[in-house]
């Protein structure tokens, strides 16, 4: 989800119809996943359900779920076009208030009184933000006993029965990703470095100071012996720095579950995923023969069929002191 000026151009001028396509191409957050968040809030937090913030709302899909549990939801995004599209998509409820705001600036935006929110949700956006500033801002928004929920899913992982086929598909996925990134100049600059560091660290670089937070739990699905990065880091300057800010009192729950958010993907679904996640990079419809060759090779490896795809996912939960 767009949360800073550096990412506005990715989603500029994309309407509600585009966001429907985007949601179809990506994994769906399951009801069991949301239950983990809500149970944490009920058992370790205040169990108050008056106000929630959805930071980096994108198409408003998370805000819509929060509106089923909270009396009021404030959904924000740095992109005005994204906010307008989300408003159109979520017209079925009057419980969501949308506003344009950079995530790190929310505490100063006056959208809600300081330290009154019961939950702050931040889905798939923390790598685009200054994590230290963002977590500090969320602390200012939350009331004592309020819950911070930050999550991110990484690159898809092919999970069929044949390991050799899975590995071949993964290599082609990286080659497609590398080709697309090279077309826009590669992965470089301080914002890219910050983003890739957060993803490569599996969000372990997101710190929760004990003066502000308690009952920190880091859930990780399908993260062992894998990378969350969407590109092959060896193609862009070598290994990305991993940062670990996990505190000694924090709980880490690691799970391996190939069925977690599982989807079925063939070559067409891989193409749709890239085109949905990198929309403005496909505005030039001139055929890229190398790129088309990789899609054809992927379809050949798959035998024209599809494979199950799973996801490495990290969910951070913390309770405001």
From Swiss-Prot:
| Keyword Methyltransferase belongs to the record | yes
Keywords in alphabetical order: Flavonoid biosynthesis, Methyltransferase, S-adenosyl-L-methionine, Transferase
The record ties this protein, via InterPro entries, to:
Diverse_substrate_MTase (IPR051052), Methyltransf_25 (IPR041698), SAM-dependent_MTases_sf (IPR029063)
A GO BP entry: methylation
> Without the gene, what phenotype results?
Impairs methylation of the flavonoid skeleton at position C7-OH.
Q: In which pathway does it act?
A: Secondary metabolite biosynthesis; flavonoid biosynthesis
EC number(s): the record gives 2.1.1.-
Q: Which CDD domains match?
A: AdoMet_MTases
Q: Can the keyword tRNA-binding be found in this entry's annotation?
A: no
Query: A Pfam family in this protein?
Result: Methyltransf_25
Q: Which family does it belong to?
A: Belongs to the methyltransferase superfamily.
UniProt source species? Aspergillus candidus
Protein's UniProt name:
Methyltransferase cfoB
List GO molecular-function terms, semicolon-separated: methyltransferase activity
State the function annotated in the UniProt record.
Methyltransferase; part of the gene cluster that mediates the biosynthesis of chlorflavonin, a fungal flavonoid with acetolactate synthase inhibitory activity. Within the pathway, cfoB is responsible for the methylation at position C7-OH of flavonoid. The pathway begins with the PKS-NRPS hybrid synthetase cfoA that uses benzoic acid or p-hydroxybenzoic acid as a starter unit with four rounds of chain elongation using malonyl-CoA to form the chalcone skeleton.
Residues in the signal sequence = none
């Amino acid at each position: 989800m767009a949360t800073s000026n550096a990412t506005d151009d990715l989603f500029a001028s994309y309407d509600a119809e585009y966001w429907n396509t985007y949601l179809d191409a990506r994994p769906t957050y399951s009801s069991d996943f949301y239950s983990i968040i809500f149970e944490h809030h009920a058992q370790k937090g205040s169990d108050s359900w008056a106000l929630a913030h959805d930071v980096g709302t994108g198409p408003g899909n998370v805000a819509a779920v929060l509106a089923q549990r909270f009396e009021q939801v404030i959904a924000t995004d740095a992109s005005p076009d994204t906010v307008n599209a989300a408003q159109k998509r979520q017209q079925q409820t009057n419980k969501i208030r949308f506003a344009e705001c950079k995530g790190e600036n929310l505490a100063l935006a006056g959208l809600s009184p300081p330290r009154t929110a019961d939950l702050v949700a931040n889905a798939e956006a923390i790598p685009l933000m200054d994590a230290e500033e963002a977590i500090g801002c969320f602390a200012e928004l939350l009331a004592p006993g309020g819950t911070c929920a930050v999550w991110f899913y990484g690159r898809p992982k092919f999970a069929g029965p044949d390991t050799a086929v899975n590995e071949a598909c993964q290599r082609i996925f990286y080659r497609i990703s590398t080709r697309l990134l090279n077309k826009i100049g590669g992965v470089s600059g301080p914002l890219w470095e910050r983003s890739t560091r957060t993803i490569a660290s599996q969000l372990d670089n997101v710190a929760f100071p004990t003066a502000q937070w308690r009952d920190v739990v880091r859930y990780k699905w399908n993260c062992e012996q894998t990378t969350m990065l969407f590109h092959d880091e060896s193609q862009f300057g070598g290994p990305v720095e991993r940062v670990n800010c996990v505190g000694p009192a924090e709980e880490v729950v690691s799970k391996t579950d190939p069925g977690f958010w599982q989807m079925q993907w063939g070559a067409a679904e891989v193409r749709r995923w890239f085109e949905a996640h990198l929309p403005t990079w496909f505005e030039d419809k001139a055929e890229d023969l190398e790129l088309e060759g990789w899609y054809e090779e992927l379809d050949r490896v798959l035998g024209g069929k599809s494979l199950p795809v799973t996801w490495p996912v990290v969910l951070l939960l913390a309770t405001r002191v």
